[in-house]
């Protein structure tokens, strides 16, 4: 079983259920922050490990990037408080604004509907005439970026307010080209589930990446700041082919076929993983 634990508390129950049933499990997208729960899960013979990204570091880096683009007064939109990812991104934003001197005007949490996203942007515009940056640090709202862009455009603010987001989407290129969207961090949607599954499969078939303990891998967020990069992301990450083909997975990630594969193998894979890397490996493949 692969799961995305939005909170640490659910893992204690999941761990017990999987242990009782003799079922291996892994995690994706999230780390475990509660030390007591983490020890309990890591001590389980059925926890294979997983893959998660550096949420705090990504939020910190994107705030620094926006500061470098001239943002001095920032509003932030994030997933609901209590979500592991949201809380870590909050920490990164806090660190970034403290270091750069950006004025954090407002943080809004848990927007799920486009109408609420529009109202939030309009309230920012009305309340903060000094506003010059909006960071979409996380959301489960559909079409969040187009909704933000339309609200800014309707009020004559598109391009005047720098917009950044964590988590790539397929609309970024258009807005980057128009210079109304400015930076995105993401790419984990494609690589985290894949590597979490690979880690679990290796454990289930009896060739774990590391012996006698879970294997957890940290992925780096990728940065996009141009429409050309966004176009390559659309083609090579969201196209017909996965970021690693079945042949690449078999040859480079499944220890059963190559017993030299180890922890360092995966660290090297992540070190080299970029949009340009995927484009180079898959250039000429059928879309």
Predicted regions and their residues:
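Hydrophobic alpha-helical
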Residues: 1-23, 93, 111-175, 193, ...
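Structural recognition of the beta-strand scaffold that forms the well-ordered cores
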Residues: 1-4, 24-29, 48-50, 73-78, ...
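An alpha-beta-alpha
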Residues: 48-107, 200-234
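Flexible loop/hinge segments that line or gate small-molecule binding clefts
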Residues: 16-56, 170-173
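Short beta-strand elements at the ligand-binding edges of bilobed clamshell
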Residues: 37-65, 178-190
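Generic structural signal for helix capping and beta-alpha/helix-loop junctions
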Residues: 34-36, 84, 114
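Hinge/cleft segment of the Venus flytrap/periplasmic-binding protein
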Residues: 100, 195-287
């Amino acid at each position: 079983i692969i799961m995305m634990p939005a909170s640490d508390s659910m893992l204690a129950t999941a761990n017990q259920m999987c242990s009782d049933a003799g079922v291996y499990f892994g995690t994706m997208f999230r780390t475990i922050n509660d030390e007591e729960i983490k020890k309990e899960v890591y001590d389980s013979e059925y926890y294979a490990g997983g893959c998660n990204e550096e949420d705090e570091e990504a939020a910190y880096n994107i705030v620094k990037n926006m500061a470098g683009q001239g943002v001095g007064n920032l509003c932030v939109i994030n997933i609901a408080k209590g979500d592991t990812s949201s809380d870590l991104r909050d920490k990164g934003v806090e660190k970034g604004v403290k270091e750069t001197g950006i004025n954090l005007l407002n943080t809004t949490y848990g927007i799920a509907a486009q109408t609420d996203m529009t109202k939030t942007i309009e309230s920012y515009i009305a309340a903060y005439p000094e506003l010059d940056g909006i960071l979409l640090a996380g959301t489960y709202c559909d079409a969040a970026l187009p909704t933000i862009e339309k609200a800014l455009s309707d009020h004559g603010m598109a391009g005047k307010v720098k917009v950044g987001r964590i988590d790539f989407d397929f609309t970024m290129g258009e807005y980057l080209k128009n210079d109304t969207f400015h930076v995105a961090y993401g790419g984990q949607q494609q690589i985290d589930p894949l590597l979490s599954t690979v880690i679990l499969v290796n454990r289930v078939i009896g060739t774990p990446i590391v012996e006698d303990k879970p294997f957890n891998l940290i992925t780096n967020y990728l940065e996009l700041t141009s429409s050309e990069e966004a176009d390559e992301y659309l083609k090579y990450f969201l196209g017909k082919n996965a970021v690693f083909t079945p042949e690449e997975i078999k040859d480079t990630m499944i220890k059963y076929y190559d017993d030299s594969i180890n922890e360092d193998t995966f660290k090297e894979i992540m070190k080299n993983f970029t949009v340009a890397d995927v484009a180079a490996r898959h250039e000429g493949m059928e879309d």
